[in-house]
């Protein structure tokens, strides 16, 4: 297997990352386990998930699969999409990020997530609120690194600028 450094973090990840979007929906638990095991046998140590994948089922299945080998793996998850019926269970507000992270940690059966992504840019929440919340969670050790998924380049640049200005995790 080929491993690469993940940016300037110093951690090494397999060149391929296994996405788990199909876990719990298109792929039942047995099919998900077969895919996961094939990846592990091939040396893959990098697994991507999100709270909204199969409305949490993907995280639950992945959490069961990583038991016993968690420390060897790089696990990602994401926050933003609607979970349940609560009107505030979506977006990048402090309330939703914290609630979503706690639920993801429980489903993944882990005390931390290696990379926690904002799944989308949230135009309704102040970027300062979002980034301060993520910085707090990095400080608490619940997430190791933060990331952005499905952001335009200008949105990433703006987030990096705000994080740098406040000396927050970026």
Spans of model-derived segments:
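N-terminal binding-site loop/beta-alpha segment at the start of enzyme catalytic domains
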Residues: 1-74
